[in-house]
């Protein structure tokens, strides 16, 4: 049985005083194996190599697939499949971020290579990427963010709400930096910009904003409570940094702009 991944469909409706429609066409569909529950893939990320070739990074049941979407966008090809933990979570939660030529993978499963997998993407396109390290200070995680300073903020399933690792100093072998557990009530998703962290606090039904300029003295700047108690899913700033866009993982909830 196949699960169809429609990874290049984006439906955008821009609501301005003069509405504009951005129409995109479907280029291709990629198939991945799944189980009988019809849960097949999780996160999608992207990477561009030194020659300008673009790749889609897709989480699936048994690990991570890297697809070449530049050579033939109408027929993407898999250039690498990276095995990962696959036990204990039938939704296959995996999350991805890149820093330079390295890919960092966290997941909620258990099994071989449990922890944050570090993949060297620099061999592309001439040869396959290789796993070079497993950061085992965090075993299971739902979400990962890496800032411009090379700090990886990792949602920690067991223990601290957020675990911080230094990937900037040694991208192929991250080291422990700090933890962030005193203020945020919960962490489903984290996003940072300019030393400010925006944390989607899940079942706490709120978004927390924190000053992280001093990791030894993190302070709360604001808390945004969600009307109607929606599950706080994620948050992202606009380019100007003047508005925060949030979503809730609750049926019939709306995208909100603050």
Label each PLM-derived region with a short phrase.
Residues 2-10:
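Sec-dependent signal peptide recognition
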Residues 13-17:
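Sec/Tat signal peptide C-region and signal peptidase I cleavage site
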Residues 18-258:
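Feature marking well-ordered beta-strand scaffolds used for ligand recognition
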């Amino acid at each position: 049985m196949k699960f169809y991944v429609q990874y290049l469909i984006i439906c955008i409706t821009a609501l301005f005083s003069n509405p504009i429609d951005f129409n995109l066409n479907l280029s291709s569909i990629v198939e991945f194996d799944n189980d009988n529950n019809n849960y097949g893939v999780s996160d999608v990320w992207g990477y561009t190599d030194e020659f300008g070739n673009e790749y889609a990074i897709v989480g699936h049941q048994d690990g991570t697939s890297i697809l070449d979407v530049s050579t033939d966008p109408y027929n993407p090809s898999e250039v690498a499949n990276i095995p990962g933990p696959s036990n204990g979570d039938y939704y296959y939660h995996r999350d991805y971020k890149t820093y330079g030529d390295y890919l960092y993978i966290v997941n909620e499963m258990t099994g071989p290579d449990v922890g944050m997998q570090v993949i060297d993407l620099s061999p592309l396109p001439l040869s396959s990427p290789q796993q070079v390290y497993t950061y085992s200070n965090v075993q299971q995680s739902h979400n990962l963010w890496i800032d411009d300073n090379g700090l990886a903020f990792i949602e920690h399933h067991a223990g601290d709400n957020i675990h911080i690792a230094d990937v900037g100093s040694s991208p192929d072998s991250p080291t422990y930096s700090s933890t962030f557990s005193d203020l945020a009530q919960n962490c489903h998703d984290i996003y940072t910009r300019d030393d400010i962290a925006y944390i989607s606090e899940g079942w706490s039904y709120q978004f927390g904003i924190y000053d992280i300029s001093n990791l030894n003295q993190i302070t709360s700047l604001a808390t945004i409570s969600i009307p109607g108690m929606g599950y706080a899913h994620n948050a992202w700033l606009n380019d100007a940094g003047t508005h925060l866009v949030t979503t809730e993982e609750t049926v019939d909830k709306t995208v909100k702009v603050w």
